[in-house]
Amino acid sequence: ADLANGAKVFSGNCAACHMGGGNVVMANKTLKKEALEQFGMNSEDAIIYQVQHGKNAMPAFAGRLTDEQIQDVAAYVLDQAAKGWAG
């Protein structure tokens, strides 16, 4: 996966709600490592599925992002979560 591309995809499509790994809509459903583990979202496959299909207030991005963009952003989210969203 291309983490630099994932960062661009995140910035352009995800950061409005998930800036710095947070969640402005549902405060407990963050992209922080602990929350990803708690909610079973701590794998690329789980993140890819949610990005493709959406859930609750989160829209589906299948058809809006390519498979490659979705894979890259999933890898970026896991990488940032492992680093504590420190950049």
From Swiss-Prot:
It is found in: Cellular thylakoid lumen. The keyword Aminoacyl-tRNA synthetase does not apply. GO terms for biological process: photosynthesis. Heme c binds at C14, C17, H18, M58. One of its GO terms (cellular component) is plasma membrane-derived thylakoid lumen. Keywords: Electron transport, Heme, Iron, Metal-binding, Photosynthesis, Thylakoid, Transport. InterPro entries: Cyt_c-like_dom (IPR009056), Cyt_c-like_dom_sf (IPR036909), Cyt_C6 (IPR023655), Cyt_C_IC (IPR008168). GO terms for molecular function: electron transfer activity; heme binding; iron ion binding. It holds the Pfam family Cytochrome_CBB3. Binds 1 heme c group covalently per subunit. The keyword Glycosyltransferase does not apply. It comes from the Bacteria. Signal peptide: none annotated. Functions as an electron carrier between membrane-bound cytochrome b6-f and photosystem I in oxygenic photosynthesis. Belongs to the cytochrome c family. PetJ subfamily. PANTHER family: CYTOCHROME C6, CHLOROPLASTIC. Monomer. This is Cytochrome c6. The lineage of its organism: Bacteria, Bacillati, Cyanobacteriota, Cyanophyceae, Acaryochloridales.
